[in-house]
Amino acid sequence: IQTLIRQAARWSAASLQDKTPLIAVLHSVYGAGYLWALKDIATDDQIAQFVDPKKFETEITKAMDIATKRAVAACPGYAGDVNSFLSQLAGEI
């Protein structure tokens, strides 16, 4: 559990420091992947022994949102055909 928490945090933090938007997306997806793996193998109660699970998920998701918005701003074609319903909910349009 601690290893997955550390890796999720490490990759997500890296994404916030990346200068290249698409590399930031890559690193944020790595971070989210570790979070999802963590959630697959551990309950919130188990995760809570090390970190607040809701806050942790919020921060990992926030890093991914920031990276994605940076990538779309730098490369508008990156967004492709967007689902306007989901984009509105995400605050992107």
Locate predicted features:
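Long, charged/polar, soluble alpha-helical segments
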Residues: I1-I93
